[in-house]
Each structure stands twice: as C-alpha cells, then as structure tokens.
C-alpha cells in the first residue's frame, strides 16, 4: 500500500485519506473528488484530530502507523460527528482506548451513532484548554456550522487552527497546501461554502470574529488543502459570502421540452447582457445542482424557467428548486417563466419557492407563453431582460 502522509509542522502530521473517485457527496456533486483530513500531533500525549469514513479505516491506520503505534493514541478530538469525520472513531477507541475530546453535543451525537457507554470523554466548551505536553489546545464552539456539534481546535504554540468543515474544499489532489494550487483554490472554497454552509451563513460572522482574534499560520480543514499563503484572503471571502455581497449577475436555470422555454431564457438573457449584466445560463438536466448553487451565491438575479407538465413542474426543475430551498440563498430578485399548453401551473410553483426564500419577485405578462413563443413574444422577453437590469431591492 502506497499512501501519502506529510509532516506539516514539527511533530504534526497530515494522515488523512484522498478520495479520488467520489462524485456525489450526499447530493452535492464532487467532480474533483475530496479528502478526509486527519491530523496527528505527537507530544507527551498523542492526539488525533478527526478521522475518516468507516471503510477508510485501513488507510487511516496506515498513515498513523508511519509515526506512532495506533495503540499509543491518548486523545481523539472529534470536532464534528458527521461520519465522514467520525467514521473510524469506534475502531480507534477499540484499539487504543483513547479518550474522546468533544463538546456536549458531540458526545450526544456519538452516542447515537456508536455504543459509547464504555468510552472515556473529556467535554469541552469555548475557551477551554487542554495541555498535551509542549503544546496547548484551545477549543471554540461553532454550532450549526454546519451541525450543532461543530467546533474548532486551535494549537496555540504552533499557531494552527484545525477548522473541520470551515474553510474546506472538495478536491482530491496530491497538493496539500493552498499555494501549490494557486488562486484557483478559491473557486473550490466558494463551491463548498455555497453547498454546505450557505444555509447557516448568518452565523458565520461571529465565527469569523473568533478566528480573527487568533494568531494563525495554518488553517487545517477536514476537506481539501491546508491554508497557508491565502489565510487572510479566505477569511475575508467567507465574510463577503456570509454578508450576501452580490455581483451584477443573473443566473438563469431552465429545462425545456420542445425548446419554447429555452428560447425565452435566451431572449431574457440577451436583454440582461445588453444592459451589462453578467449572465450564466444552465439547462438543469445537463448541469450539477451544486455548480448552479455556487453561481447563485453571489448573483443578484435568479431566473427559473419550466414548461408545465400535467399541472406541475418539469421534473429536473422541481429537483433543482427542492435543492435550492434546502440551501436557502437569501436576498435575491426572482423571476419565474415558462411555456404551457392549456393550463399554466409551473411558474406559480416556482414563485411559491421564491416566496418561501424571501426573494423579491418580478413578474410580467411576457413570462408565460402558450405552446411556443413567436418573434414578437421573444422581443418582449428581450425588453423585459433590459428592464430587469434596472431593478434593485
């Protein structure tokens, strides 16, 4: 077995697992794969921070064994109980009898996944510290980023923040640091934020305040690469994304049966572009939902088009709307459009989702058409796009 391990600072090691093949992460498209980052600290007490999925146990053990006997683990820090991070905890406890360090919610959630009645726990809260020898570990609770049990671990002496899901990216690569990839890493971080953290972004400013008070040389997330060169930049981007800062951008999402809705989408897009709006158009059946949500994160306008099928939405549009309702982007201008035969229902269903999300809905008589749009109707769609570009909150 040839697997990668890396010393990231003196006595601190990346011993995670690279998942080259994964393309779907509980509904979130991962075209570039992912990693499950686990970190080993060798000190008077040997500490493992987070683990990996249960079926990756052998790879994780291999990495740990390069530096210590896994039986010699003293502490396992569980920053987050989701099983891509805690999946190997039960087997590691069985091998090592290590004490679990987590918060009260973390203990509760672990007990719902595993038989923990014989496990030893140290329960921590924000501000608590544990000395492991030459180093001290400090803990910061970040509930609902993105589970109630989430927390951060900070190594004061080494100036390392072990951030778990915060600042993560789904990317499988041989590179372990941000500067090895370059500024392209921000797009991966944006994609992760949009699809994992967007529903809870109102909580992020408080977490950012806590992080900014720390002296940080490395941010070590549990997915993707380690932040070293771009620490200030990624913190600032998180702040921007959390504060709903938008660009003059429209995302148009549609599906079509006989190209009627497609023609409307493109006509509206032409009008928007005429007024200088950046436009992204996606036929939803040909694009991953996570890719679309990444573009919606900083868009001002969200336009959704669907033909009516048996008094309902076109199936892939319905799937997209359910996903968007789950991710919950805020402060958008919403437009529903589409074609129908004898009963128009799709646009009303789209607007119901918009209302649920608090979008400002813009309507116009040109946004629905029976059967197929003629040139005069497409001209109205084009003019509507131009008018839409002048609408704000």
UniProtKB/Swiss-Prot annotation:
- Domain Flavodoxin-like, residue spans: 250-389
Please give one Gene Ontology molecular function term for this protein. Answer: FMN binding
Q: Which SUPFAM superfamilies match?
A: Flavoproteins, Metallo-hydrolase/oxidoreductase
Q: Name one Pfam family in it.
A: Flavodoxin_1
> What PROSITE patterns does UniProt report for this protein, alphabetically?
FLAVODOXIN_LIKE
Q: Which PANTHER family match?
A: ANAEROBIC NITRIC OXIDE REDUCTASE FLAVORUBREDOXIN (PTHR43717:SF1)
Q: What is this protein called?
A: Uncharacterized protein MJ0732
């Amino acid at each position: 077995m040839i697997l990668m391990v890396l010393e990231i600072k003196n006595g601190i090691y990346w011993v995670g697992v690279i998942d080259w093949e994964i393309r779907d992460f509980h509904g979130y498209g991962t075209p570039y794969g992912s990693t499950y980052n686990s970190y080993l600290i060798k000190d008077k007490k040997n500490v493992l921070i987070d683990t990996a999925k249960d079926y990756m146990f052998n790879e994780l053990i291999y990495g740990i064994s390069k530096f210590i006997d896994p039986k010699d683990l003293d502490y396992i820090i569980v920053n987050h109980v989701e099983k891509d991070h805690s999946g190997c905890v039960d087997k590691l406890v069985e091998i090592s009898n290590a004490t679990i360090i987590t918060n009260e919610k973390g203990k509760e959630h672990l007990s719902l996944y595993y038989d923990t009645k014989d496990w030893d726990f140290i329960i921590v809260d924000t501000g608590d510290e544990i000395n492991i020898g030459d180093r001290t570990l400090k803990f910061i609770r970040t509930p609902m980023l993105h589970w109630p049990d989430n927390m951060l671990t900070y190594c004061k002496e080494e100036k390392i923040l072990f951030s778990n899901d915060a600042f993560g990216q789904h990317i499988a690569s041989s590179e372990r640091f941000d500067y090895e990839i370059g500024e392209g890493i921000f797009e991966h971080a944006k994609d992760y934020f949009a699809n994992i953290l967007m529903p809870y972004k109102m909580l992020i400013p408080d977490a950012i305040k806590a992080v900014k008070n720390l002296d940080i040389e490395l941010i070590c997330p549990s997915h993707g690469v380690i932040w070293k060169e771009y620490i200030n930049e990624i913190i600032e981007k998180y702040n921007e994304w959390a504060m709903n800062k938008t660009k003059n951008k429209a995302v148009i999402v549609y599906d079509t049966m006989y190209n009627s809705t497609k023609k409307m989408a493109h006509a509206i897009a032409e009008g928007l572009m005429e007024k200088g709006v950046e436009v992204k158009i996606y036929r939803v059946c040909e694009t991953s939902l996570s890719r679309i949500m990444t573009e919606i994160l900083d868009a001002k306008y969200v336009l959704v088009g669907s033909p009516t099928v048996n008094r309902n939405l076109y199936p892939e549009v319905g799937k997209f709307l359910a996903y968007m309702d789950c991710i919950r982007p805020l402060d958008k201008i919403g437009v529903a459009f589409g074609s129908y035969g004898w009963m128009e229902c799709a646009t009303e269903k789209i607007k119901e989702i918009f209302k649920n999300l608090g979008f400002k809905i813009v309507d116009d008589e040109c946004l629905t058409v029976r059967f197929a749009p003629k040139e005069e109707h497409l001209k109205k769609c084009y003019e509507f796009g131009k008018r839409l570009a002048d609408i704000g909150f």
